Amino acid sequence: MEEKFRPPTWIRFNSFYNASRSCPTRASLLTGLYPHQAGIGRMTFNDNLPGYRGQLTENGVTIAEVLKEAGYQTGMVGKWHIAETPLKSDQREWLAHHVYHEDFADKACYPVNRGFDDFYGIIYGVANYFDPLSLVNGDIPVRNVPKDYYITRALSDSAVSYVNRYANADKPFFLYLSYTAP
């Protein structure tokens, strides 16, 4: 498959080094920038400093945005965790599903608005494996899951589904799969 979709200026990255925690590493991996240049120098809380906004900067272009512009289909499955996720006043009630909020973060920061055609996964970094709080499909919250739901299996199934759909298309695809641990 690599030969079939090899662009004229193919680049293979052999190494990726980053000493940060999960969100800063994700931001760096997706943008090719140092975490603070991507806007997530610490975690997904806004520290009111340019490099520590808690979400990707507008000028930090994601690999999905670049590949989409080059004609690729782009999909993401799994843990996003690079959008500012402010604490709600009723956070504990929300986590226990006793109250419901429509958005988990600014939707402009969701994967489908940062270069990914498709997204199935969680916006927050925390996840209950059996009933994840911030589960979305595209940018629509998934409020109910089956009783036998297990997020790792669901993410794997979704990734396989995307690969099967993309592989039958006439253009190359990029799939970013990010499981929830850690």
Over which residues does each language-model region extend?
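Formylglycine-dependent sulfatase
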Residues: M1-P182
